[in-house]
Amino acid sequence: MDTGLCVPLRGISGLLLLLCALPWAEGAKVLVLPMEGSQWLSMRDVVRELHARGHQTVVLASEVTVHIKGEDFFTLKTYAFPYTKEEYQQEILSDIEKTFKTQHFVKAFFETTASIRNFFDLYSNSCIALLHNKMLIQQLNSSFFDVILTDPIFPCGAVLAKYLQIPAVFILRSLSCGIEYEATQCPNPSSYIPNLLTRLSDHMDFLQRVQNMLYYLVLKYICRLSITPYESLASELLQREVSLVEVLSHASVWLFRGDFVLDYPRPIMPNMVFIGGINCVTKKPLSQEFEAYVNASGEHGIVVFSLGSMVSEIPEKKAMEIAEALGRIPQTVLWRYTGTRPSNLAKNTILVKWLPQNDLLGHPKTRAFITHSGSHGIYEGICNGVPMVMMPLFGDQMDNAKRMETRGAGVTLNVLEMTADDLENALKTVINNKSYKENIMRLSSLHKDRPIEPLDLAVFWVEYVMRHKGAPHLRPAAHDLTWYQYHSLDVIGFLLAIVLTVVFIVFKCCAYGCRKCFGGKGRVKKSHKSKTH
């Protein structure tokens, strides 16, 4: 009997092939230990996408967290922190306030060193509070997570992954002393790869290479002081002596928030993946408020001004200098600022507590971007093709600014020393000199010419690690070598010993031959002369 449900055999075969071609997916469990600030924004996008693909995500943060809030696409777990929320915020803000103080180089260096140590002390105490919470650790251990996603600048996640024997994926911009290259066994020659905080390019003269080497040694010393608490904690948990390099080398994949449009070309390892621009999302329509600001700017357009999520207030004197400079340009300026309103603020400058930075940068009327040179802001500027005036404040921001300036896509100002004239001239330069717009558009084109979006690439590698229970096949054998084996010093010594031995034997043979040939004649002549006498 014909029921009308007959399907041609060819159709069934096609359906089966289609089903077989679909990627096999099973919801996995992801534990996330994020870092505060803009670092969380990138990780948050990855977490959201993992949730959309059916994975369960638990985000572990301290109870005094400032930026990490509970959302519907992950479960937020908090742990006790040895500071109150007010003390925690004060610790962070006090270091930021120091960036606006003019100091002698030596004093600034020691204060920066102290700030780095305070930063590590703050988070190492947080790590101790977390890892000594036996009940929480037992809960995490019994939850059978498939992967830990963490930023190794807060090494607690790496220590926890090593302790629980869970595959780890790191997402980061960089670490303070190049320890990421030791942990991945990635070559890092100081001859053409500038170290963090040096503000050097990849083309260095002799004195700059000396400076680069000295910076490396100083950062190594600071790092040694700063990471000791984590090494002690890891050794206590694992019940054996362990270095932080060994703990970090446990990572299956390293996701670096950079690419070679911004960063200088360098060697990489198989488990190093570059996801620069992961925060560049599709431009959304502006709200009525901001659309009105943009439309009112007329033919001159707008300038977007933001110093990032960590800085929204600056000293009054400096704010007035900035306000004076902004009032001299014809563009409308949208300035994210929550401090006291400068008394000389011009009519063309609008203060806002928050602004949709990426959406504004993507608007065709945006002429320039004043930024602190954080990697998120830099990449949003690159993605949207907006030339920049950069005011780096701390950390890798100086290096990011140097890279963009080297590529002719922006102008860098020293926020401590600049005057209103300096800022005015910088803005007019990047707006009126067409080469800056052309260079940033070229960088934007290079950055966007890729086979896969950075967010999809990041999620792929997280799922890859979960599917295969890690990625040990990407781990180089260099991890198993001693320092002298890595540099082949034992081989060089062995070959040198052979060469020296051969040279010694040849020398002895020649000396023996000479004695036989010439020494005998000399004795005969001497004997003959004696007989004559």
From Swiss-Prot:
The chain crosses the membrane at residues 491-511. Residues 1-27 form the signal peptide. Its EC number is 2.4.1.17. Its main location: other. It is a single-pass membrane protein. One of its GO terms (cellular component) is endoplasmic reticulum membrane. The keyword Transmembrane applies. CDD domains: GT1_Gtf-like. SUPFAM superfamilies: UDP-Glycosyltransferase/glycogen phosphorylase. It is an enzyme of class 2 (transferase). It catalyses: glucuronate acceptor + UDP-alpha-D-glucuronate = acceptor beta-D-glucuronoside + UDP + H(+). Expressed in kidney. It holds the Pfam family UDPGT. It is found in: Microsome; Endoplasmic reticulum membrane. Keywords: Endoplasmic reticulum, Glycoprotein, Glycosyltransferase, Membrane, Microsome, Signal, Transferase, Transmembrane, Transmembrane helix. Glycans are attached at residues 141, 295, 433. GO terms for molecular function: glucuronosyltransferase activity. The keyword Endoplasmic reticulum applies. PANTHER family: EG:EG0003.4 PROTEIN-RELATED, UDP GLUCURONOSYLTRANSFERASE FAMILY 1 MEMBER A1. Belongs to the UDP-glycosyltransferase family. UDPGT is of major importance in the conjugation and subsequent elimination of potentially toxic xenobiotics and endogenous compounds. This is UDP-glucuronosyltransferase 1-2. It comes from Mus musculus.
